[in-house]
């Protein structure tokens, strides 16, 4: 099964459980590292930060449904965690949520002679984001290789 289809299938199973427990399903990833497969579930919540207890609670409930439905053929490790301080920004809703914050955006190839830009996220609309760094740059989302918040403590 293709990875994107597998993640869609897992999201359909996992998202209702995560939301029932009053968390947001921030992001899912399924990766192979050092010969082992990992299903990583990143959770968030509006108020306060994610604790180890939050991750354990979600992990137990999600593990139950994944064991029953068994959407992943390979054996894998389940990891549940917070997106972290320098969280990745993957969806338009992530970019919109963090307008006004400092971000680092890396490009597929180059854009206006640059491979990346660090600056303040100004806008996120219609498959474009605008970042003000060395200069203000309007970036098509298909040119984004990766984007992260730059940490503030």
Swiss-Prot record:
GO biological process entries: ribosomal small subunit assembly; translation
Database matches in Gene3D superfamilies: Ribosome maturation factor RimP, C-terminal domain, RimP-like superfamily, N-terminal
Keyword Cytoplasm among UniProt keywords: yes
Keywords: Cytoplasm, Ribosome biogenesis
Subcellular location: Cytoplasm
InterPro entries, per database record: Ribosome_maturation_RimP, RimP_C, RimP_C_sf, RimP_N, RimP_N_sf
Primary site of residence: cytoplasm
Signal peptide stretch: none
GO cellular component: cytosol
Keyword Cytoplasm listed: yes
UniProt similarity note: Belongs to the RimP family.
Task performed by this protein: Required for maturation of 30S ribosomal subunits.
Protein name (database record): Ribosome maturation factor RimP
Recorded name of the encoding gene: rimP
